[in-house]
Amino acid sequence: MEYVTMVTFPVESQAHEAFSHLKNKPVTSSYTILQMVIVKNVDGNVVPKDGFDSGQDTTDDTWMGGLLGAAVGILGGPIGILLGGGVGLLAGSLVDESDAADNTSLLAYSSRSLLPGQTALIALVQEDDSADFDMQFEGMDCAVMHWDAAEIADEVDQADQIQKELAKEARDKLRAQRKADRHEAIEKKRAE
């Protein structure tokens, strides 16, 4: 089964140390790392720092291949900024309060757990049991969370749809404001 795993570190060097270790041995008898990325919360913006792609095929390359890139793009884009100040609009649209409390949403969890200055390693991993992969972080000051990759793909699709709707709403409001401004200018000229 494929999972998205997020490991948050308060110290960036530990994230890079874990990344290097995993990059040098991405395939074991119990797990295969398909992709991974290091991201850092820089003043509320999620910034990619390093990435790795094993070149291994995923179960369904058509939607899984760009999953981490899409998730990081959402976390680092306008929706991620909305989430940065708290769970915010998007998380409220995607998950209800009980889901946010039990960490079933990558976006909601990230907004609460990846604090400014902190770094995370996010990996797409094929594994039957997360225990062996989790052991790679033993002795490190970090928090490890796992999500079913199919659920994250659905969450990313929902976030993308919301982002498109917000962009359309913003364009419509700008268009209406310009129209109102033109109408006001015309009325002003008529009054002269």
Describe the function of each predicted region:
Residues 2-10, 119-126:
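Short cationic amphipathic helices and targeting signals
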Residues 86-124:
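Membrane-engaging insertion elements
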Residues 60-75, 172-192:
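Extended, charge-rich low-complexity interaction segments
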Residues 1, 23-32, 138-146:
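A common structural junction motif
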Residues 54-101:
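Short, low-complexity, glycine-enriched hydrophobic/amphipathic alpha-helices that associate
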Residues 112-174:
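Amphipathic, membrane-inserting segments
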Residues 17-20, 24, 108, 112, ...:
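Solvent-exposed alpha-helical segments within well-ordered globular domains of core cellular machineries
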